[in-house]
C-alpha cells in the first residue's frame, strides 16, 4: 500500500458522540479525500458488488474530534435506479467512517466483522472503515439501504424512505444529529427526497 498523507483523512471529523457542531466538507476537499482513500482500498476481490466511485460527487461531514464520514456515490447511480431497485442488492456507493461505526443491535459491532483500511504516513497510520452501500427492494415493495462490511450480507439494513422533500440532483448528502452520550444518527439523503437514518456509536475499545 502506498504511503499517503493523513491530514486530509483526519480532517474529516464529525460530531456524533463527542462533538457539538456538524459542518459540511467542501466538495473539492471531499473529492481529494475520496481519491486518496479509494487508492488505499484498491479493488477488493471479496466486495459484495462493484462500485465505480465518483470522486467529483463525494460528500463529507466534519466537526470537532477525530471522527469522520465520507460518502461516495456510484457513477451509475440514478433516481430511476433507486426507484426501480430489485431484490438483489445493487450499488449505491461507498461510505467511509473513522472512529465511529454503525450500531448493530444497539451496540458497536465486533471489529473483526468490519472492513478496515489502514492509511500509512511514515510512522503514523489512520484506520478507516469502508462500507459498500447497496439498495434492494424489501418484501413490501419499499427500498432498503444496506451497509456491507466484510460479509456478503449487510451488517446493517435500514429503510430508504421516499419523503415529500423536493427532489435534487445531488446523489448523496450526509448530515447527522447527536442522540445519546455515545450515539448519534447519521442521515443519508439520496437525490434530495430519499432518506435513511442509521444509528452510529463509538467503536469498541
Model-derived regions, located:
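Mid-length scaffold segments of soluble, non-membrane domains
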Residues: 84-152
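Bacterial N-terminal signal peptides
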Residues: 5-15
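N-terminal secretory signal peptides that target proteins for export/translocation
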Residues: 1-2
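Primarily secretory-pathway and cell-envelope proteins
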Residues: 19-97, 117-119, 153-205
Amino acid at each position: 500500500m502506498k504511503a499517503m498523507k493523513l491530514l486530509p483523512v483526519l480532517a474529516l471529523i464529525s460530531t456524533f458522540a463527542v462533538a457539538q457542531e456538524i459542518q459540511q466538507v467542501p466538495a473539492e476537499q471531499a473529492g481529494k479525500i475520496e481519491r486518496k482513500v479509494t487508492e488505499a482500498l484498491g479493488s477488493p476481490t471479496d466486495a459484495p458488488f462493484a462500485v465505480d466511485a465518483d470522486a467529483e460527487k463525494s460528500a463529507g461531514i466534519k466537526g470537532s474530534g477525530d471522527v469522520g464520514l465520507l460518502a461516495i456515490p456510484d457513477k451509475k447511480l440514478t433516481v430511476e435506479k433507486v426507484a426501480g431497485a430489485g431484490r438483489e442488492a445493487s450499488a449505491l456507493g461507498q461510505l467511509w467512517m473513522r472512529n465511529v461505526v454503525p450500531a448493530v443491535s444497539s451496540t458497536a459491532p465486533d471489529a473483526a466483522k468490519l472492513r478496515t483500511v489502514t492509511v500509512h504516513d511514515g510512522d503514523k497510520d489512520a484506520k478507516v472503515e469502508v462500507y459498500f452501500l447497496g439498495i434492494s427492494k424489501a418484501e413490501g415493495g419499499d427500498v432498503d439501504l444496506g451497509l456491507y462490511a466484510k460479509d456478503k450480507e449487510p451488517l446493517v439494513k435500514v429503510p430508504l424512505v421516499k419523503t415529500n422533500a423536493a427532489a435534487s440532483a445531488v446523489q448523496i448528502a450526509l448530515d447527522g444529529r447527536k442522540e445519546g452520550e455515545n450515539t448519534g444518527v447519521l442521515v443519508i439523503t439520496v437525490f434530495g427526497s430519499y432518506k435513511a437514518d442509521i444509528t452510529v456509536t463509538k467503536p469498541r475499545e
